[in-house]
UniProtKB/Swiss-Prot annotation:
Residues 1-20 form the signal peptide. Belongs to the sea anemone sodium channel inhibitory toxin family. Gene3D superfamilies: Anthopleurin-A (2.20.20.10). The keyword Signal applies. This is Calitoxin. Keywords: Cleavage on pair of basic residues, Disulfide bond, Ion channel impairing toxin, Nematocyst, Neurotoxin, Secreted, Signal, Toxin, Voltage-gated sodium channel impairing toxin. Residues 21-42 form a propeptide.
Length: 92
């Protein structure tokens, strides 16, 4: 009986520690969101399609591993690297 109680207690402690490591504060979530936005902007700056204006707000491209995947509404306009293409929306 003592062993069972000890096992349950240890499992509770382990579960509580795991949960505390996974929970983020609102400040941490905000920081993660800002980092993702910064990464998105950096990717957009790398992705320039022919005819795009030099400022970020007029760039039409976005980076994908393959422009032909998904809903087939994107067209390759540039290559960023061996693993990534710069794609923009196909005209409708």
């Amino acid at each position: 009986m003592k062993t069972q109680v000890l096992v349950v207690l240890v499992l509770c402690v382990v579960f509580c520690l795991a949960e505390s490591r996974n929970s983020m504060t609102s400040e941490e979530r905000g920081l993660v969101s800002l980092m993702r936005q910064r990464d998105d902007i950096a990717k957009r700056l790398q992705c320039k399609c022919k005819g795009d204006a030099p400022d970020l707000s007029h760039m039409s491209g976005t980076i994908y591993f393959s422009c032909e995947g998904g809903d087939n509404s994107w067209k390759k306009c540039n290559s960023i690297s061996v693993f990534a293409d710069c794609c923009h929306k196909k005209p409708t």
